Amino acid sequence: MAYHYSHDSDRRQPHGGYNYPSNYSNPSQYSIPDSVYSGHSTNTPRVPSPGGYHQQPSPTTRAVNPAYYQPQPTASSMTSHDLMYGRPSPGPNQYGAAPADVVRGPGATTVPLSQQAPYQPYPSHTDYSDEDKSFASTTHLVSPQKEWGVGSVVPVTTIPPVNQLPYQPYQAYPPRPSPSPITHRGGTSHWHAMRKQLLERRVIKQIPLHNGNLVMDVPVPKGVIPSTKGLGVMDGEMDSMRYSAATCDPDDFMGSKFSLRQYLYGRKTELFIVMTMYNENSELLLRTLNAVIKNIAHLTTRTRSKTWGPDSWKKVVVCIVADGRKVVDPRVLKVLQLMGVYAEGVMKDHVVDKETQAHIFEYTSQVVVSETGEVGFGSTPIQLLFCLKEQNKKKLNSHRWFFNAFGPLIKPNVCVLLDVGTKPSGHSIYELYKCFEKHPTVGGACGEIFADTGKWGKYLWNPLVAGQNFEYKMSNILDKPFESVFGLISVLPGAFSAYRYDAVANHADGTGPLAAYFRGELMNQPGATATIFDRNKFLAEDRILAFEIVVKKNARWRLQYVKAAKAGTDVPATVPEFISQRRRWLNGSIFAATYAMVCFWRIWTSGHGIFRKFTLTFLTIYNLFNLLFNWLSVSSFYLAFFFLISSSISGSSDPFNGAGDEIFQVFNKVYIALIFVVLVCSLGNRPQGSNYMYTFCIFMFAVCQGILLYCAGWTVYQTVPHTSEGWEDVSGLFENRTFVQLALSLMATYGLYLISSLLYFEPWHMLTSFVQYLLLLPSYVNILLIYAMCNLHDVSWGTKGDNGSSKDLGAAKKVEKDGKEMAEVALPTKQEDVEALWQQARQELRVPVKEKAEKRSPETKRADEDRNFRTNVVLLFLGSNMLIILLFTSSTFTNWVNSHFVDATSSTFNPYLTVIFYAVLGLSALRFAGCLLYLIFRMFGY
């Protein structure tokens, strides 16, 4: 008889077999044959391990519940290691050594034994009675907590106890000797020597293949196992880590009969959280991971909830996907090793002549690692799933592992997407989940992403950070609430967003949001026929997914902004990084918005009501106008500069005391020269190679903006009465067209910023970042947009794809023994090697490393066609903007304006600016109405 795991009590119940997916052709092969247990009573219940291996239950005479049986420890004083390998003879290291003796670096002194803390003795590992033996299937795995059949040794306690932490580590651990200097490979010479020793001392073992797949349970170091385990932890769940060498494509993961612990345990998953990373450092990983642990701990405190409670951690799975084994930061692997979800020496690059696509580690951990390297135990267990991709195939492929490989097995209710480095606040993940629970038609949601300004706002001294802080704040106050009212948010940021799994799932015919989302991954493959338009569109793949959810055929999903969910993120603090990031954002958003315009008719094939279909169509028209204004923003900004300054100096009163005409001529030519400098740099230079030139252009554009604001203020000042008698007739003031247009345009922008910020009780960015944003505004238009258009051919993320296979980990060779398929693998067997490497990883994290500048490698495939397309678009873009400038600055147009529009009250104000100002007023009024409606709806819980 085989068993499956009950959803309610997490206890194994007889059910005639596992509940395997319907596409598994032969579920009976997962059952445990009775022949395995020859020599034992057939009445003894047998419990399958999460790894799927055959187990030999310990004999017992005690009466047990036939529905659930947990093997009891024997009365012998032998350790788990002794039970597996036999009791070795005493050796010179019978009583062990202090960790400092194991990892002592150059110049470190040995602490006398009399001053050392008492350590538990452990047996010598100089001899193993069965080191040269092969492991038959009948010798494997007494119970999940004794799955030592993979060849590794059960570690024993050789370290001082660690602190108990609620969910944040504290710096209360006693200091250790400083390790030797960090090498260029991300570790000390001691760590690499220990790793080399561990690899060299591996022993060939024979492991049963599970449906042709290499899946094994690896014991974790004793320092990872807490003395007090969290509520609901199954026996053995924290004693071993599960490793699977996935040799298939993500779409074939379940079809290849791979499985996950949550599926085998029968746990229902409400939240499936993914953290994607490339080569980010350990500090960024810990910032995000510790924040997620805090959020999960908060869920366990909600004892009055129908969904959450003390054992809520069992309903949350945290998945970390690293994009490329050879590019991941070594210190990141050390962090995961300390948490028990990664181990050196067990990965294989080939299994039975098939290339490994991803290394999957599963472990339930209570270890918390601080950003300073301190290690402690949290009160809440965390179900961790670490997917280390063998090759660098970019972020979309990482999400394909998450959604298409793991999702069908875990079947979550809500999926949360995070980028490593994003820090959700204490209750943010719950706030996102509550939105889905409260509104059954919500298919996707996002929270507020704010710029990390540092302690006491110290990063705001950098004008670049301050400008982005203001931009982020106003987007969260005006844009996202406005779009949320309509139910279609143009972008759910991949750095912090959530999706209902049913909403993103494809239809039965394979079409749907996820199919459209992952189409972008295939476009950059060798031999792909995708156009440069499509490849630029998928630079903003999160916009594509958001649009596809809303227009899903015969469905009525909508998107919502959750103000209460907040997450902080680092923003670029240097000019090259800022320009490179915005190049991806602008190109992706422009082409994704164009795609949404072209496919807007799909709104009418969805399942939305007629009223929402009309409102979504109206939103599409609004987005079309915004796209048009963005396209002509270079010419519009220059014309505003030209006419405002020229009109202010043409009157009887010169704002520059008679030097206005000379100043205007100089800065007009400077402005035009700066545009051509930016154009030349954008066509031939990377921002990293032209840092000083771009910085100089930003400074000069800020000077031009300062002159523009001064002249605008001077013009308004000249139009208002200067005496108390003049203010008695206020109606005459509104008859002055110049005053009305300038005043309304200023109120529609800057006044709107202030009023809406006060309504949302967030006015502080107006004080700390508003001026910096105003001075950076011309650079947003003239530098970022021109650079983005000049680099349409570059559809890279700054990372280089890796399509080659590696053979540096060793392979698992297929052999047969007693008619069963086995894999010969080299595995660690020396306990002191595993413990010493764990200790050294723990020690090295306490030493900060110097950050290195990242080097970007541009994409070169299809370079000729891409650059030709780039040239044509740049000519069209600059040509249309120059045509507008030449038309409205020509003498013919100026004379026509003077003869038809100029009068005593309007000075020399240009009608083109009138159109621009009223358009800005109308669009701003719509945004304000949207943010106001969002507040009203929020008050009534909608």
From Swiss-Prot:
Its EC number is 2.4.1.16. GO terms for cellular component: cell septum; plasma membrane. Residues 71-80 have a biased composition (Polar residues). Residues 1-13 have a biased composition (Basic and acidic residues). Residues 18-33 have a biased composition (Low complexity). Residues 1-132 are annotated as: Disordered. It catalyses: [(1->4)-N-acetyl-beta-D-glucosaminyl](n) + UDP-N-acetyl-alpha-D-glucosamine = [(1->4)-N-acetyl-beta-D-glucosaminyl](n+1) + UDP + H(+). Disruption phenotype: Abnormal capsular morphology: abnormal fiber distribution, decreases capsular diameter. Decreases extracellular vesicle secretion. The chain crosses the membrane at residues 590-610, 625-645, 663-683, 696-716, 739-759, 770-790, 873-893, 916-936. Glycans are attached at N23, N587, N736, N803. InterPro entries: Chitin_synth, Chitin_synth_fun, Chitin_synth_N, Nucleotide-diphossugar_trans. It is a multi-pass membrane protein. Keywords: Cell membrane, Cell wall biogenesis/degradation, Glycoprotein, Glycosyltransferase, Membrane, Transferase, Transmembrane, Transmembrane helix. Polymerizes chitin, a structural polymer of the cell wall and septum, by transferring the sugar moiety of UDP-GlcNAc to the non-reducing end of the growing chitin polymer. This is Chitin synthase 2. It comes from Cryptococcus neoformans var. grubii serotype A (strain H99 / ATCC 208821 / CBS 10515 / FGSC 9487) (Filobasidiella neoformans var. grubii). The gene is CHS2.
